[in-house]
Amino acid sequence: GFFYVAWVIRKLALAEKIHPAAAVSAVPVAVVTGSHEQYAVIMTLLLVLSGVYLWKAHRRPGNAVLFWTLAVIDVVSLLVIALCPGNAGRNAVSIADLPVYATFGFGQKLYLGLLSIERVFIANADIVFFLVVLIWTWLVWEKTKDYRRTFPSALPLLILFGQTVLRTAYPGLSGLFVMPGEILEWSWSDLSTWIPMVYLAVTVAAMIYALYQLFGDDLFTFISVLLLVGCGFGAGMVLGFMATIYVSGERVYAPLYGILLAAL
């Protein structure tokens, strides 16, 4: 559903003609897709960026009625989600099972959210993330033909390879690679607390660098892709502010999967 709605919004932004059947089917698909809070936020960003793009190009969307229909669906979806107690209910149940979570402050919850991205999505050598970074690195090389400009784009791959080999060769070091769903307390002075954050910082910096090499010639496109990828990472990071992080697994990274694949 996300890919279909994104495809329709893209055609609207490019003022391309949309088949009547595609336009009609986009409405129920947008309703279903927008019922998920993370996808609703991403739809909002896509519509806003499309509106800015159309405004900059001084033209109307390919189908103005469909564009505004999708916008109304998105706004209504966000309002319904904001008034829906579903997430609050699930969070309350999780806190009842893990009362220690209620004692966590802002910094601890932020750390859990960042850790969940680095440990669950990246450090597990997720195939989507691996392929995306591999293709980005190859595209940077194809564009620049300069290994010195390509090497920084490959840093996430080197990190993945290095720590995977390390964990496989030395199981005793597994304590340095904890998963957020396996810890209820940690010490800010421990090395294992900060290694994932360093990996995450280097990975994000390398991804931004790769995107700049690929899209830096068009500032609007670069910022748009950067915002979308950031929105995907944020969808995973915000989970740290809910006790459901201990039971959600990789389900919450579906939006980031979609964004990374769409960016290709």
Question: Where on the chain are the PLM-derived regions?
Answer:
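Transmembrane catalytic cores of multi-pass membrane glycosyltransferases
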Residues: E37-L45, V52-F215, T221-L226, G232-V252
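Short hydrophobic alpha-helices at membrane interfaces in multi-pass membrane enzymes
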Residues: I9-A30, V65-W68
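Membrane-interface alpha helices of multi-pass inner-membrane proteins
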Residues: P20-E37, M43, V48, L79
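Carbohydrate-recognition beta-sandwich/jelly-roll modules
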Residues: G1, V31-T33, A57
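C-terminal amphipathic "assembly/sorting" segment characterized by alternating charged
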Residues: V247-L264
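Eukaryote-skewed repeat-based solenoidal scaffolds used as protein-protein interaction platforms
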Residues: Y4-R10, V32-S35, V238-L239
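Specific aromatic-rich, kink-prone transmembrane helix
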Residues: G1-L14, V48, V52-Y53, I259-A263
